[in-house]
Amino acid sequence: AWQVLVATDRNALKEGKADIWDSGKTVGAESHLVAYSGPAMESMKDYWWTVRIWDGKDKVSTWARPARWTTGMFSESDWRAKWIGASWQDDSVPEADNSAPIFRKEFTVREGLVHAKAFVCGLGWFEMSINGGKVGDDYFVPGLTDYTARPALLTNPRIPLEPEVTAYRTLYLAYDITDMLGKGANAVSMLLGNGYFHEGLFNNNTIANYGYPRFILQMALEYSDGGIEYVCSDTTWKEAHSPVVFSNLYQGEVYDANFEIPGWNKPGLDDSSLSHAVLKEAPQGRLTANMGPTDKVLETLKPVSFERLEDGTFKIDFGKVISGWVKLDGVNVRKGDTLRVNHLSEYPAGRCEYVCASDGKVTTSPRFTWYVFREAIVSGMENLDVSQVVAESVGSNVKPDAEFDCSNPLFCQIEKIWRQSQVDNMHAGVASDCPHRERLPYTGDGEVAMPMVLANFDAASFYNKWIGDVKGSQNP
């Protein structure tokens, strides 16, 4: 038998109390996918739950440690925020602007903050920060979906597809930001990369161009007196050109520190001279909560060989092919230096550059693209120590749930290569046919690999998301 308690207060559960749902002692052997049978849940609300069981001798266990789920937006009317973007990026102008705009807003938190949540979608991809700290450890979010009707489908004869599909959708993410806020003045910032939304593919054409970047953000601040205050994206936000002056999934990323605005993502900046963000058209896609794994740094690799070449550059071998990037940490630079990382890969290898604005130390890695490489050549600095460089493997955070080992070293090596290759091909909620060239989710490759992936990784939610994309992308 089992008993489930659901409450709005974690501490109440520790006392065996439930203000939402108490299943009572329920006789049965169910242990998986037991349906919630309490009252209808509310949007943007936290629910705590716990469970205890009885064994065959009717001996009861202790209550499990409480766990939490947070509900998202149950209807479009729950969104108070607006889609906004940069005033200088005009969707009617087809030429590609590959820069990454940045936005900010200051707000006040009063006494008695209990909990704060952020619901956010930034297209193509976003990096959110509060009071100088990055929100979450995700990359390449939100995942790729059919955001909206693609203009190129109406005009490009090489793509014989109907522009309408059955279910456009756009994913939003939710973050607990309580510990990032303090009483008084706070600041939130959004940096937008182009991702798959505003993309020039290999040669900067606009075949995949849905429009310029835009975002929607709604923060809910809950107080001990029961009040809820909202901080939302609207035209009161300020905008600027970010130091990410070039952001392209296929062609790389360039960061120019001369465009940094000190204190941009912290309270107290005088931004009165900056222009305001503008309203942008919302994608046709329904805003839907992200339910799949996001991309994260999965592994950090130290060099297995490190060599200074005759031309003064540094050739580094990290021991295996990964999808990710090289991270430079604490490198001594001079004003005007341009640090370059050439991730040795098949075309398109992609640019990776950092322009230095002053003398000092620099720590840097890309944000809105990945590279496929084992070796890299690093240049632009006078000296580089092996301790100042690592490679970070980045991919969808699907946990391995099976292992393989046998007496044949060749078979073991093949399995390791396959496992790494599969992880390298899982980005932004889809599985690609190759992570370095096309970077697109061809279903033929995905269907063949899926049984093997599901046997080796906890990837059910990953494929649920992707197959949902496929289902919704059919013509009516």
Model-derived features: positions:
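Extracellular/oxidizing-compartment recognition motifs
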Residues: 1-46, 50-436, 444-445, 461-466, ...
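Active-site lumenal/periplasmic loops and adjacent helix-entry segments of GT-C-fold
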Residues: 439
